[in-house]
Amino acid sequence: ALSSAASDVYKRQTVPDTDKMSILYYNQNQVDNEYKKRVCENFFDVSAGVYTYSWEKPYKGDLEREIENYEELSKQSTSDDEKSFFDDYISSLKEQLKTATDEREGAGDYSADAFVGSKGENMYMISFNSTETGESGGFSIDYYPSDQLINYRPKEGASSVYCYSSDYYDGEDTANTATVSQDDAIQQGLSFLAGCGISDIIETGCTDLIWEYSDTSYNTLASEKSGYVITYKRSVDGIAPYTPSVYNIDSLNSSDDVWYDTMDETFELQIDDNGIVSAYCYDYFKATGDKKENVDLISWEDAVKALPKAVNTYYAENKTQYSSIEFNNVQLAYYKIKDGDKYEYLPVWVFAQCEKTGDGDSSQSDDGLD
């Protein structure tokens, strides 16, 4: 049954203008050769060459460079175990040299799934996710795997560096030393994604970029704050749709964990003074251009009236351990559903119970009931 506390949540809601919402239609995106070409040539310095990358048949020059990096790490190692680990890995790389290719293979028709090229003085890899299974789509950009990120941002005494969002940083609060402003970095990201053919997005979060330096024993030597981690999401009529990643859904009908994935389209870019450091883009859908405007919506009052019956009917068939349900997250939002082989974003009232995680966060991504 619904708790009386839920009515307090209802009273605090700001109900948006409900006569201007639409239904928008989408197809599942196809990561075809043209898609790959557009992304690669939008990022790499094409004049310097774009090449395929094969994990099975690596390029000899890559292996030689990686061997050189690990030989230096072996020299810096402070224990026999560390040195043994590096030396064993060097031996495996030298074994791969026997069958490595002497020349890189050009991108050609972009039918491969991974490509390498340069951006300024640095090399990067772009990897694409296939949509053939209907489970993934998009791409990632990473600093070239045969190099170490420490070569991109070296620091005396450090053998490695790891960069991540300040959301996960618990060190001393210092100023962001990047000369690029947060607003300019956000615009850089939007411009890059637009060049990839991804324009219907909106920025939903921006944090500082942390660079954490370590020695060969992975002891942290120093941390610096320089750059930004920017998150964009699909924009439907100018707002980010409701795309929860709900897990541990309560049900007594199954002993297994129950979860629900809405294929959240998220585009996360790390940007510093040199530009894009990395990117992780989940580009699942593409708008068809079709749109049904000013659709009729159930009113707020009618939605609240219908809620108790809907909840009680659902849990009559799906038993729960909850004795009461207190919705603490209510919103009018766009939500994606599948209709045949197409998808549509349509306006819905969302009533959710979200519970706090160990870090105190309470969001639509936590354990919950919708």
Identify what each model region corresponds to.
Residues G360-D370:
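C-terminal structured interaction module
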Residues Y169, A185-D361:
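Segments that shape or occlude catalytic/ligand-binding pockets
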Residues A1-V258:
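Preferential activation on post-signal-peptide N-terminal prodomains/segments
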